[in-house]
Amino acid sequence: MRARLAVSTAGIQVELREILLRDKPDAFLHASPKGTVPVVELADGTVLEESRDVMQWALSQNDPDGWLDVQHQDPDHTAAFLDALDGPFKTHLDRYKYASRFDPDTALEHRAAGAAMLAEFETRLAARPSLSGEKNGLLDFAALPFV
């Protein structure tokens, strides 16, 4: 979702293909043996396999709404936020949301840990209009599918 948002905002034309993850097409697996979505195959053969990378690529081409402003202003904070979102937060979210695939006995612990991270988001939002600062940007749209 966040990769598509960035590609759309950047105004980049791409061919979207819906992938049924239980029946992955050979061409998809050839481009990305990892077999996860999203995948963007660039004209030069470069393959982007992470939504965060797709967002960065698209917005580096065209950033009409200034989503990357926060990254230009504070690259260390931006990287740390995205690392926490894509790492610990996503881990806690998955282990709570899909507890039956993991350890159901720890689901509530993961919910509490994820809630603590959301409380940090709330603290930031109490001080300014968006996670990215004065206007919605990269951090807000990167977090959107998870909250």
Could you describe each region identified by the protein language model?
Residues 1-115, 122, 126-129:
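GST-like domain detector, emphasizing the conserved glutathione-binding G-site
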Residues 134-147:
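GST superfamily/GST-like fold recognition
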